[in-house]
Amino acid sequence: LSCAKWLVGFGFALATSLAMAIEEPSYKLLLQEERMELRAYAPFTIAEVKVQGSFDEASRRGFRLIADYIFGNNRSISQPDRSEKIAMTAPVTVEAQTSAEGEAWRMHFVMPSTYRLQSLPKPNNDAIQLREVGEGLFAAIRFSGFTTESAIETRTQELQQWILTKGWAITGKAQIARYNDPFTRPFNRRNEILIPVKQP
């Protein structure tokens, strides 16, 4: 029950953040064909966590862990005896990981551009890792509705086929990106599959 109350409370906080102008990673749109895009992303910094379980289980647990970090379970760099709240950004991204222990996923939040890796508060939870992501090319497909496993599989296959028709090389795993709070109606939701690519 306490977990449910926490998630509802966080959902309202997230909804408030998303009602205002919320920051997203900076990218340049290089190509657009219907729902497909090729983007060149600038470098950004993330907070991430690796979690076990099904997609839904891992999403809930990973979300809670990183949200706990940005809401203040951390140590400020400038004042180590104090914590620091970090603004919510979008999207929240999940990526499948290889694990001998069963299903595993890596979830990350992009940190606001006002921070650099060296200036981010230190997590109190060792499961939270901070790292920089370099610039790179990503193919993307946008869709609404719920991010069910079948929807993710269908959109990923569509995007992979588009990449193949362009003659690009896939350089990493597909990422599921979600941009909305839990209270957004399914038909208004913005979801994306992102796949890192390399042009010949």
Residue ranges and their predicted role:
Residues 3-6, 12-200:
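A solvent-exposed interaction/effector surface
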